[in-house]
């Protein structure tokens, strides 16, 4: 095993994100101890943004 640039490519074996206890998505960062999807570990409020869901207008097919 050599050191330097060739060895840096071998640092991608582990996974940074595991399944979140609160939202169930694979977005809980192990080292930061916070969920990127719902904000668990960072705040008590669930992280919500309007742009995450498609806006539906009228009486047509509703997205679930």
UniProtKB/Swiss-Prot annotation:
Keyword Zinc-finger: yes
One GO BP: translation
Cofactor binding: number and manner: Binds 1 zinc ion per subunit.
Matching Pfam families: Ribosomal_L37e
ZnF endpoints (C4-type): 20-38
Residue positions binding Zn(2+): 20, 23, 35, 38
Gene Ontology terms, MF aspect: rRNA binding; structural constituent of ribosome; zinc ion binding
Cofactor entry: Zn(2+)
PROSITE patterns per the UniProt record, alphabetical: RIBOSOMAL_L37E
Gene Ontology cellular-component terms listed: ribonucleoprotein complex; ribosome
Cross-referenced InterPro entries: Ribosomal_eL37, Ribosomal_eL37/eL43, Ribosomal_eL37_CS, Ribosomal_zn-bd
Keywords noted in UniProt: Metal-binding, Ribonucleoprotein, Ribosomal protein, RNA-binding, rRNA-binding, Zinc, Zinc-finger
Family: Belongs to the eukaryotic ribosomal protein eL37 family.
Function: Binds to the 23S rRNA.
The protein's name in its UniProt record: Large ribosomal subunit protein eL37
């Amino acid at each position: 095993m050599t050191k330097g640039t060739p060895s840096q490519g071998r640092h991608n074996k582990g996974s940074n994100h595991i399944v979140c206890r609160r939202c169930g998505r694979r977005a809980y960062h192990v080292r930061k101890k916070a969920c990127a999807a719902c904000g668990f570990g960072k705040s008590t409020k669930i992280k919500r943004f309007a742009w995450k869901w498609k806006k539906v207008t009228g009486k047509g097919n509703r997205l679930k």
